[in-house]
C-alpha cells in the first residue's frame, strides 16, 4: 500500500484550521500542530471589524492587522508613518469583529527598534488594549533579543523576514535571498527567530526554492507572500486579493474578485438614481 506523506494526509476535520468544526479562538498550539499534521492554512490581512467579520465567517483562521493598513486604508505611501496608536485602534476593531480567528497585530516602525524593553511596552499595548493573540515584527538576527523578551513575557511572536516593508528606505522593494550569501543570511535569520521563540515566520518576496528550504529546515510554520507554494501557509493583503487596490499589484497576487469595479459601478448607479430622481422612491420613504 502506498504511504501518504504528512503533507498528503487529510487533516482531522475537527482540528483543521480552515474548515474545522471548532468555534473557539484559534491558539498558537493550533498553529504549531498544523505543521506537525502537514496542514496548510490561509491568512489574510484585516483592518476593520466589518471586513474581519466576513473573513471570520468564511473560516479564515488567522488574520494579520498589518501595518500595510498605511498603504491600503490610511493613505500613506509606505508603512513607515504608521503609528502604534493607529495599530492599536485597528487591531481592537478586528478583534471585536471576530470570534474564532487568531488575530496578529503588527508592531509598526519605530515601536521596537530601540530594543527589547521598547518592544515589550509596544507589544503589551496591543495585547492589553486591542486584545490581539500575538504580535508580528520585522527582522531576523537583528530582532532576536526583542523576540526573546516578548516570548519570555508571555507574548507570542510571528517574525517577518525577507522583504521587510518597514526597511524600504534601505532595502527597496526587491526580491530577497538571491545569491549564495543572501540566501545564507536569510537562513540564519530564519533560524535566529525560531531560536528566539517565534511561533511562525513570514517569508516575503523570497525565491520559491529558498522558501522551500527554509520550510524544511524550521520546525515552526512558514507563511509565504511571494515565496512560492511550499511554505506552510499563505498570506495576502485583502485589498489586493479582492481587487480593491488600484493600479499595478505585485506578481504574486491572485485576484479573486474585482471589488474596485463593483464598488465603482454601485456608486455611479446610486449617483445616477439621485440625479435622475429615481431614488428614493415611495418604498424607501417613511410617513
From Swiss-Prot:
Signal peptide interval: none
InterPro entries assigned to the protein according to its UniProt record, in alphabetical order: Pantoate_hydroxy_MeTrfase, Pyrv/PenolPyrv_kinase-like_dom, Pyrv_kinase-like_dom_sf
Keywords noted in UniProt: Cytoplasm, Magnesium, Metal-binding, Pantothenate biosynthesis, Transferase
Enzyme class: transferase
Reaction(s) catalysed by this chain's protein: 3-methyl-2-oxobutanoate + (6R)-5,10-methylene-5,6,7,8-tetrahydrofolate + H2O = 2-dehydropantoate + (6S)-5,6,7,8-tetrahydrofolate
Biological pathway: Cofactor biosynthesis; (R)-pantothenate biosynthesis; (R)-pantoate from 3-methyl-2-oxobutanoate: step 1/2
GO BP term, pick one: pantothenate biosynthetic process
EC number annotated for this UniProt entry: 2.1.2.11
Cellular compartments per GO CC: cytoplasm
Cofactor(s) in the UniProt record: Mg(2+)
Statement: the UniProt record of this protein carries the keyword Ribonucleoprotein: no
Keyword field contains Metal-binding: yes
Molecular function terms, GO-annotated: 3-methyl-2-oxobutanoate hydroxymethyltransferase activity; magnesium ion binding
Pfam families, A to Z: Pantoate_transf (PF02548)
UniProt main location, coarse: cytoplasm
Annotated active site: 204 (proton acceptor)
Cofactor annotation remark: Binds 1 Mg(2+) ion per subunit.
Localization terms from the record: Cytoplasm
Residues binding Mg(2+): 67, 106, 138
Binding-site residues for 3-methyl-2-oxobutanoate, renumbered to this chain: 67-68, 106, 136
Assigned protein family: Belongs to the PanB family.
PANTHER family (alphabetical): 3-METHYL-2-OXOBUTANOATE HYDROXYMETHYLTRANSFERASE
NCBIfam families: panB, PRK00311.1
Binding partners and assembly: Homodecamer; pentamer of dimers.
Functional summary from the UniProt entry: Catalyzes the reversible reaction in which hydroxymethyl group from 5,10-methylenetetrahydrofolate is transferred onto alpha-ketoisovalerate to form ketopantoate.
Name by which UniProt lists this protein: 3-methyl-2-oxobutanoate hydroxymethyltransferase
Protein's organism: Streptomyces avermitilis (strain ATCC 31267 / DSM 46492 / JCM 5070 / NBRC 14893 / NCIMB 12804 / NRRL 8165 / MA-4680)
Amino acid at each position: 500500500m502506498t504511504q501518504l506523506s504528512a503533507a498528503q494526509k487529510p487533516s482531522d476535520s475537527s482540528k483543521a484550521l480552515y474548515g474545522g468544526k471548532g468555534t473557539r479562538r484559534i491558539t498558537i498550539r493550533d498553529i504549531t500542530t498544523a505543521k506537525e499534521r502537514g496542514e496548510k492554512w490561509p491568512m489574510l490581512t484585516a483592518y476593520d471589524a466589518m471586513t474581519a467579520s466576513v473573513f471570520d465567517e468564511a473560516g479564515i483562521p488567522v488574520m494579520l492587522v498589518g501595518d500595510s493598513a498605511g498603504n491600503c486604508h490610511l493613505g500613506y505611501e509606505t508603512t513607515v508613518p504608521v503609528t502604534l496608536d493607529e495599530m492599536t485602534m485597528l487591531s481592537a476593531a478586528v478583534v471585536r469583529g471576530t470570534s474564532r480567528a487568531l488575530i496578529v497585530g503588527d508592531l509598526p516602525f519605530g515601536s521596537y527598534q530601540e530594543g527589547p524593553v521598547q518592544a515589550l511596552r509596544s507589544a503589551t499595548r496591543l495585547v492589553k488594549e486591542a486584545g490581539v493573540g500575538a504580535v508580528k515584527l520585522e527582522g531576523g538576527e537583528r530582532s532576536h533579543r526583542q523576540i526573546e523578551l516578548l516570548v519570555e513575557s508571555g507574548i507570542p511572536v510571528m517574525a517577518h523576514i525577507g522583504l521587510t516593508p518597514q526597511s524600504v528606505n534601505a532595502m527597496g522593494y526587491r526580491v530577497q535571498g538571491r545569491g549564495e550569501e543572501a540566501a545564507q543570511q536569510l537562513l540564519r535569520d530564519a533560524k535566529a527567530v525560531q531560536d528566539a521563540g517565534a511561533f511562525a515566520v513570514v517569508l516575503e518576496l523570497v525565491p520559491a526554492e529558498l522558501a522551500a528550504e527554509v520550510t524544511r529546515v524550521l520546525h515552526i510554520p512558514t507563511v509565504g507572500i511571494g515565496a512560492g507554494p511550499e511554505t506552510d501557509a499563505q498570506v495576502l493583503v485583502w485589498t489586493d486579493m479582492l481587487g480593491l487596490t488600484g493600479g499595478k499589484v505585485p506578481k504574486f497576487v491572485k485576484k479573486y474578485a474585482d471589488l474596485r469595479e463593483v464598488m465603482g459601478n454601485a456608486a455611479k448607479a446610486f449617483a445616477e438614481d439621485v440625479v435622475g430622481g429615481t431614488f428614493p422612491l415611495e418604498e424607501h420613504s417613511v410617513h
